[in-house]
Every structure is written in structure tokens, then in C-alpha cells.
Amino acid sequence: VVFYATYFENIAISYDSTAAKVVICGTDGNNNHGYGIVGTVSGTAISFGSAVAFATGSGAASTSTSYNLQADKTVIIYGDTSNSGYPTVKIATLSGTSISFGSAVVVQNAAGSWIGSVYDSSNAKTIFSYVDNGNSNSSYGTIIVGTVSGTSISFGTAVVFSSKNTEYITSTFDSSNNKVVLAYAASDNTSSCRHCFWKCNIVRDGVGFSCGKPS
């Protein structure tokens, strides 16, 4: 089933368990605008609502989405190419097959790439990971905690989890051990750490992290 009738990239998907809908986000390859689309699954079939833009202007890059169960909101993070590639979050609200977005909130005032998100159900927080491409920690893997309230979000302090050239970050939440697990590739001039896993635990009232050693 075609859900977007032109070139579409940077695709990510999440599931809204309250609305029983999937949310797909990505970038139009022609105008680079970021769009969100709601999907309804019925048996082995799926249907879609209309695409709604969450990023216009120069568009979006490296999109990711996750569902925050406590807030009952879908969270979208993307690189805002209209704002120097800064990692930016918008909170989405679903109504049937329609989707709308709150105001943009910048995660950091520097470019980011390999952007991802995951929901920590133990702490009811949305966890964002990205490569910091613009600060003194350029190319370092970075993680930050987000607290969703309505269509707003606030952030804790960003923590570096990889002080090497980092890429291909992906993450999941281990509900048995209440840990965020990151998988990523990292390298330096000696290629001493190429494929790593790092387990992180939220501390300090759910706005900070402690991380174990990569293996």
C-alpha cells in the first residue's frame, strides 16, 4: 500500500497504543519538507490519512518518532535544515486519522545527525540520541532526556555516551531491566572501538543518565 505518492526518505514509524494507530514520518524528496501520516491497520490491510507537514522551509533531515504513553503523545525529532540542522522536537496529537503538531522546541543550538528517540516506560520519559555536529563535542554520541507535558517538552542536560566519531545510532528500551540500550558505530584514528553497545540508566529524578562501559 502506497502511503506517499512521491519520493520519501528519512522514514521512521511509531505506534500510538491508545489510538491504535501507526504514525509514519519522513522527508519529501522533492521539497525536503517533513511530513507525518497516520495509518490504521485492519487485519492485513492498512489505510492512511492525509500527510501533514511538521517542517517546511528548507525542511527536515534524520527524522525519528516514538510514542509517549504517559502523555499520550507521539514525539517527532528531526534535524531542522531551516535552522542549521539543529535537532528539534515537535509533539503530535492524533484525532482519528488526522495529525497536528505543537510548536518546535530546539534540543541543542548546534547541528545534529543520526537522530533517534525511544520511550522509557519505567520513568515515563522520551530519550533522544544524536551525534553532536556543532559543539566542542563534535561527532560525539550524545543522549538527552525529554519530559512531555501536553504539546510541550522540556529537556535535562545532554550527556556524551561516546567521545569518538559516532554514527549509525539506534536505541531501544529493555523493560525487564529498565535500561535504555544504544547500539552504534564509533571509531577514532586507531579504530579501537568500531561496533559498541552501551546500557544507560536514568538517574537524578529522571533527567540525567549514568552509563555502563561499552562492550
Model region roles, listed by residue range:
Residues 1-215:
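Extracellular, repeat-based ectodomains that mediate carbohydrate processing or recognition
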